Amino acid sequence: PVKYARAVDVNSAANCIRWYGEAVDKVYDEIAPTADTALALITREPVGVVGVIVPWNYPMIMAAWKIAPALAAGNSV
C-alpha cells in the first residue's frame, strides 16, 4: 500500500492541485461569446463552506479532486 501511495496517489494529487492552481487565473472574468450588441461577463463567486466525502481507496487523489477546485474557487473546505 505505501508503494502504491507513493507511486500513484501522491503524484496524482500533486498534479491535480497543480492543475487547478494553474487554471484559477484563467477562469475569472472571462467574456462569453455574444452578439455584437451584447456583453456577457462570466463571474464566479465562492459558495462558502464545502463539505467533501472521500472514499478509502486512493484517499489523497480523491480528496485532491474535491478540495482543489473548491479552494481554487475561493471556498473553504
Task: List PLM regions with ranges.
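Conserved small-residue-rich beta-alpha loop and adjacent elements
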Residues: 29-77
